[in-house]
Amino acid sequence: MIKTNDFTDYYTKRHANMIKQFEQWFRCVRKSATPHITSEQSERVHEIALKEYETLIPEIPYIGGKKVAGTRNLVGSVILLAYIRAFEKEGLSERVIGEIVYKSFDAFFARIPAVFGTLAGKLMFVPWYVKKRKKTMERVAALPYTEGFVSSFVPCVDGSFVFGQDVSECAIHKFYVKHDARKYVPYLCLGDYPMFRRLNIGFFRTKTIGHGDAVCDFRFKKGKTESGWPPENLAEWQGSREN
């Protein structure tokens, strides 16, 4: 397999764009953190997080670049890790930080135009698009990057969903474990709920790698996706936690 450190300059070469993404996230993070910190703390969080992010950029593994949608997800999670570290230094609890992370996702995906969400919801279950997603999963799973995502297509047999996706390896989980931040992974997983809600795609999940399960069992159906907060209402959050 190809070692991911063969591409250590991939993100550093795109430094300007990486910082642009960081600032885009800050607008969402600042809004979500307002009930918990002062404006002075907010500016300090930004400063601390930016320095943290600068140190993390060279450590982000190459998992396929622009040809893999998971790359953007991974970068977003690294940005959030930088903010998480800053919030920790401000003395915020895990639960409060987790709530800020979730609401930051909510604010981030709220920027998606409603018309795009309507189109995405209709496209998701068109047969040719389902086949395309299956092929994409197979292509990404075959990539030789050890720190990336691996998932497989799951056909429906009982009518409870249209199709599924079992993620057996998660780049975000690997990165967070490596940086002693595993306990926050379940909160990162919650970001899927506001995303699919905004895209008008029905989605549910009962297991996640972040909670110690072998796979994240994404299941897609027609209809609405429930809110991801508070997480105790979700099947994936129930039972013992192993983070």
Task: Show the residue positions of the predicted features.
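C-terminal edge-of-domain segments
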Residues: I209-G223
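Short, cationic low-complexity segments
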Residues: P194, N233-N243
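Conserved short secondary-structure elements within globular domains
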Residues: V185-T208
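Amphipathic interaction/junction segments at domain boundaries or subunit interfaces
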Residues: V75-H179
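N-terminal, charged low-complexity regulatory/assembly segments
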Residues: M1-E90
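Short, charged/polar, Gly/Pro-enriched secondary-structure boundary elements
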Residues: I172-K174, G223-W229
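Short beta-strand
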Residues: V154-P155, T206-G210
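Conserved aromatic-histidine-acidic binding/catalytic patches
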Residues: K67-V75, Y176, D180, Y184, ...
